[in-house]
């Protein structure tokens, strides 16, 4: 009898554990700024919806490959950069969203609302690809993408590898340098890129590599996403950021619901939460992400280092990530022929 009582008690306790266990929302994201995101994004959502957020962290490629191998199982939401978002959609891993659960989309910039169509998730932040150069080393100001081909920059610049988020913009700029569309005439774009090669000391795959090259005096200029600027500026105070006269390239990060998620509605509520004015402002103030919510107002000091303001965002060159993805294999091969020699 005593054994039976203990047995029933154990069953009851295990059932209580199931009954009172919090619902979990599994989010695939980068591992950066974890403490700040916990404080301003995850914890408030957990409290409001009585849910536990579980993170899967890593870079774009690693996390997307993991999602492909598992066919999306076990993950509810995924943060990805533009080209990887397109890849995930084409692989059939992204669920179509119910926009009625995302009322805050009406408060964000147009370019962020439906970057891959109304069926898929919005961008929650916007960055830009521009040029950084050291004014102590380069006296003739850099103002244009075309300046990357100047003969007095031989061996002085670094550009992002083709496989990075910003990499494809180098091909687009090479095409523009000779007045062609890189998608329509890739042979001319890569011929133009080959002409720039003499100026490129090396390519980089990690932002820390670029910052280190500046710090060690190996390079005097580089193409980068704007978030790298603060790191370079810390090492090289004479470094400046340039939004080229033709316009910087827009780079967005998206949040999407993974197809097959058993928590789809909750996941959509999380996306809406991230787009809210409060969360967008809180995250901007601690320099984690640039806001896309148009209601977020920042002072000049508060917006320093961020991509902020309708005039700046309106000046961007957009990137057709669908075309980038469809040309990716050929572009990588052509790139490697140039830079592996």
Segments (PLM) and residue ranges:
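A ligand-binding cleft/hinge motif common to bilobed small-molecule-binding domains
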Residues: 84-87, 215-216, 221-238
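A bilobed periplasmic-binding-protein/Venus flytrap-type ligand-binding module shared by bacterial periplasmic
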Residues: 130-137, 173-178, 251-263, 271, ...
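Extracellular/periplasmic bilobal clamshell ligand-binding domains
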Residues: 300-341
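Early extracytoplasmic/lumenal segment of secretory-pathway proteins
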Residues: 22-87
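Periplasmic-binding protein-like
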Residues: 127, 191-196, 204, 235-259
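Short beta-strand->loop
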Residues: 95-104, 121, 149, 237-249, ...
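Extracytoplasmic ligand-binding site segments that recognize negatively charged/polar headgroups
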Residues: 32-38, 74-75, 79-201, 205-215
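Mature extracytoplasmic/periplasmic domains
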Residues: 258-316
């Amino acid at each position: 009898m005593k054994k039976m009582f203990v047995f029933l008690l154990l069953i009851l306790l295990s059932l209580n554990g199931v009954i009172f266990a919090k619902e979990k929302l599994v989010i695939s994201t980068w591992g950066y700024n974890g403490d700040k995101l916990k404080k301003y994004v995850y914890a408030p959502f957990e409290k409001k919806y009585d849910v536990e957020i579980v993170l899967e962290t890593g870079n774009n490629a690693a996390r997307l490959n993991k999602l492909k191998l598992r066919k999306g199982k076990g993950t509810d939401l995924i943060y990805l950069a533009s080209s990887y978002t397109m890849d995930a959609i084409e692989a059939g891993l992204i669920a179509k969203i119910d926009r009625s659960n995302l009322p805050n989309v009406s408060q964000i910039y147009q370019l962020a609302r439906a970057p891959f169509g109304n069926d898929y998730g919005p961008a929650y932040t916007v960055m830009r690809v521009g040029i950084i150069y050291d004014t102590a080393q380069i006296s003739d100001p850099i103002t244009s993408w075309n300046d990357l081909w100047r003969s007095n920059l031989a061996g002085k610049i670094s550009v992002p590898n083709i496989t990075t988020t910003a990499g494809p913009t180098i091909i687009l700029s090479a095409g523009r340098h000779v007045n062609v569309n890189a998608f329509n005439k890739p042979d001319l774009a890569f011929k133009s890129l080959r002409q720039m090669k003499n100026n490129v000391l090396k390519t980089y795959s990690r932002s820390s590599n670029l910052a280190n090259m500046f710090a060690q005096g190996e390079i005097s200029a580089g193409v980068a996403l704007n978030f790298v600027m603060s790191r370079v500026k810390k090492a090289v105070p004479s470094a400046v950021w340039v939004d080229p006269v033709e316009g910087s390239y827009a780079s967005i990060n998206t949040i999407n619901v993974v197809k097959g998620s058993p928590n789809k509605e909750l996941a959509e509520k999380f996306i809406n939460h991230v787009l809210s004015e409060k969360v967008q402002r809180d995250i901007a103030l601690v320099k984690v992400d640039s806001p896309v919510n148009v209601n977020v107002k920042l002072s000049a000091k508060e917006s320093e280092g961020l991509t902020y303001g309708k005039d700046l965002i309106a000046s961007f060159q957009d990137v057709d990530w669908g075309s980038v993805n469809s040309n990716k294999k050929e572009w990588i091969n052509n790139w490697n022929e140039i830079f592996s020699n």
